[in-house]
Design a protein with these regions (language model features):
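A short, polar/charged loop/turn motif at coil->beta-strand junctions and beta-hairpin connectors
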Residues: 47-52, 151
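Extreme N-terminal tail/first-helix region
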Residues: 2-47
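C-terminal edge-of-domain segments
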Residues: 3, 7-13, 24, 143, ...
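Short, structured beta-strand-loop surface elements
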Residues: 16-19, 86-141, 147-151, 159-160
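Residue-level detector of beta-strand face positions
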Residues: 55-57, 107, 156
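Short helix-to-loop capping/linker segments positioned immediately adjacent to catalytic or ligand/cofactor-binding
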Residues: 42-44, 63, 141-145
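Short beta-strand segments
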Residues: 50-85
């Protein structure tokens, strides 16, 4: 379980502990703040799509600070797919590198309470299966893959 300090500058979420640095993107900062303040009852969809999101907490690869990213909710049998699409951009999202650098310091909030997860990048048949689930949950992922030359990475996150 996580506790957020009144100042919102620090978050304690074992094992993710440290100074929280909000995203430089205003819409991300606002969505994360509204989601957390409402225990997941507000700002729980991707903008105006009505499609559900989760908040993923990581440790910054370079800064070492706690970072938070809203990602599409792709859930199956208690596990989550974390799809590093970045809208089909040629490079991976920053949080991808955070997961690679600190895979043991990741939490997900899907509703009122965050929980710690184990994450691993997947490939082969397992990736293909999760990719199908991801596209079913958020069809634009298919367009993103066509748009980029890189294979969009997929991680599986399971509660600890």
């Amino acid at each position: 379980m996580c506790e957020i300090a009144r100042s919102r500058r620090y978050i304690v979420c074992m094992p993710v502990v440290g100074e929280y640095e909000p995203s430089p993107a205003e819409w991300v900062r606002d969505q994360v703040a509204a989601y957390e303040e409402s225990n997941g009852t507000r700002a729980n969809t991707l903008r105006d799509t009505g499609l559900p999101i989760i908040i993923v907490t990581t440790r910054g690869n370079r800064s070492g600070k706690v970072r938070k990213s809203p990602l599409m909710r792709v859930h199956h049998d208690g596990a989550y797919a974390l799809v590093a699409s970045k809208g089909g951009a040629p490079s991976h999202p920053v949080w991808y590198y955070n997961l690679l650098a600190h895979p043991d310091e990741v939490a997900i909030q899907d509703g009122p309470e965050p929980f710690d997860v184990d994450v691993r990048e997947i490939s082969g048949e397992e990736r293909a299966t999760w990719w199908e689930r991801a596209v079913a949950a958020f069809p634009p992922y298919a367009e993103y893959q066509v748009k980029t030359d890189r294979e969009i990475p997929v991680f599986v996150a399971t509660p600890k």
